[in-house]
Amino acid sequence: MSQKIHILPESLCNQIAAGEVVERPASVVKELVENALDAGASRIQVDVENGGKRLIRVTDNGCGMSREDAFLCLERHATSKVRAEQDLFRLTTLGFRGEALPSIAAVSRFTLRTRLAEDVEGWELVVEGGTVKRSSAAGVPPGTIIEIRNLFFNTPARRKFLRRDETELGHIGETLTRLALSCPEVCFRFMHNGRMLWEVNRQKSLVERAAELLGREAVRDMLPVERQGPEGMRLHGLISSPRLNRSGLGGMFTFINGRFIRDKVVQHALADGYRNLLAKGRHPVLVLFLEIDPSQVDVNVHPTKHEVRFRQQALVHDFIVKALRDHLQQVPTSAMPAPGNSPFTVPARENAASVKPDETKPALADTPAAFSAGEGSSRSDVPYPSASQVTETTDSYDAHDSGVEGASTAPPLSEEGLFSVTADVRPSEQTENSGFFASLRLIGQYQNSYLVCQSEKDLILIDQHAAHERIGFEHLRKQYLAGSIERQLLLFPLVLEFDFRLGRIVEEQRDSLFRLGFALENFGGNAFALKELPRMLKEADAERLVRDVVDEFAAIGRSQAVEIELERILLKMACHAMVRAHQRLSFDEMQALLDELDKTPFSSNCPHGRPTFLRWSLGELERLFKRA
């Protein structure tokens, strides 16, 4: 009987390995630049032609290699970074498998030039399709130069999957942006077809590097983070205020021990950290570094090394969430970046340009080919304190997001109702401990929906419904976490009838409903008597409120813990209780609202992620009136 199983030839093994490691030109750039960083390079230049299809050249001034090491680096699983099994669990380098160079050389025309600093001359190796064609001494500067020509020349099926030059160039730019952000102390230069796209010099801080690559305007809306955690963990970097957000994940740069990762645990923690601060479908812009004991994280999970596995996932997740929430909560409202202001100094931009996927053009959804300065980060189309960002209407704020019918139904306008100034309008009494909102000079109420205030030279417009929504939500949340929400006894119990499905849900969740402030007793069949409801919601439509909360329980499902969707339920309750738009407020009511905002965490945004206030500087107003 003939033998069916046989050992594959080395060249075919390398091509198979290349399928895992080398997906596109950007994958080649990533592997080569990571090798340069591991070699201690302080200057790295990347030259590409035709989006990396024709040429990729990476030049570095790292430690270089001897003749023997130059030959060995082309062998599979040959590496200087791992010697024993235990080394896999304390990795401090970006590379470690010894697969990249032989895999790349197997599918390209590969040239390696390298020299040790102490040697008089270097060495050149020419490889084609994994076979060494020529080797000789060469005059090269200390460091390493690797050229990759005609990628996938011998695997045409793989080459057919490459996109347009602009698309591949965009992916290379994105890869280099990640690597450059991770190493501010390293100089990077990026060239395409002989033209320099961007260059970043050695910088002393992450702020300077982020300003070069993401844009000065973006960095002005970012906040520094520094937090020590359990088990020696440390989180540091920059996070955006809620004002700066994007529709995709392209603005989130997360690193573990200096390695860029896209980990589900970290992504979930970031989403939790910004929960109820961003509108649905929006994501923050951030550059975050998590330093952790290498023995507590496994990076040998995926060929791209973008996925990791933590030994204590819950510990890492909760540490990141708490660090983000604490930093976002501690930033005073008055310090939230307004146009031209920043929590720290941003250096002048030189000639760097971010090369990243353009997420704003549907026709180019898979074509990262936008090359212009400052496009590495973008402001949201959801407004925040700057008036220039307003693109949404009042109607979309009230009815759709709150889930309460009729929330935005406006009464007929009248001269009295359009803009009202209370007779006793006066500057708020300021003390040394006055918060931002309490220090505002209250001018009046516009269209019974917005409070008009003045802060020094700035004009402030406050959305009364969004502000009350945040206040009510935080009050309910605080009471719930304390054990139970305060209840109000009804003089006459309200009998509610449900269908069979919802009736079973009410019966099953009566304890949870009681903790939320609703005391319900079975009244026979699928009927229940409501005897108590949250004191804060005593003015709300009790029947509709209970039915809405029960519907939320039905949406959660029996298999999920109530706490998972707790904030959604509390938000629904807050929507019923709060002051609506088009509701006339007295001066004392408006002043009480301002005072309460200062006592409320995350008061710059409602729980849906919309801003509670907008700010115009005097300069902005003068420009609008053509006076500047």
UniProtKB/Swiss-Prot annotation:
The keyword DNA damage applies. It comes from the Bacteria. Pfam families: DNA_mis_repair, HATPase_c_3, MutL_C. InterPro entries: DNA_mismatch_repair_CS, DNA_mismatch_repair_MutL, DNA_mismatch_S5_2-like, HATPase_C_sf, MutL/Mlh/PMS, MutL/Mlh/Pms-like, MutL_C, MutL_C_dimsub. CDD domains: HATPase_MutL-MLH-PMS-like (cd16926), MutL_Trans (cd00782). Keywords: DNA damage, DNA repair. GO terms for molecular function: ATP binding; ATP hydrolysis activity; ATP-dependent DNA damage sensor activity; mismatched DNA binding. GO terms for biological process: mismatch repair. Gene3D superfamilies: 3.30.230.10, Histidine kinase-like ATPase, C-terminal domain, MutL, C-terminal domain, dimerisation subdomain, MutL, C-terminal domain, regulatory subdomain. Residues 375-396 have a biased composition (Polar residues). This protein is involved in the repair of mismatches in DNA. It is required for dam-dependent methyl-directed DNA mismatch repair. May act as a 'molecular matchmaker', a protein that promotes the formation of a stable complex between two or more DNA-binding proteins in an ATP-dependent manner without itself being part of a final effector complex. Belongs to the DNA mismatch repair MutL/HexB family. This is DNA mismatch repair protein MutL. The lineage of its organism: Bacteria, Pseudomonadati, Thermodesulfobacteriota, Desulfuromonadia, Desulfuromonadales. The gene is mutL.
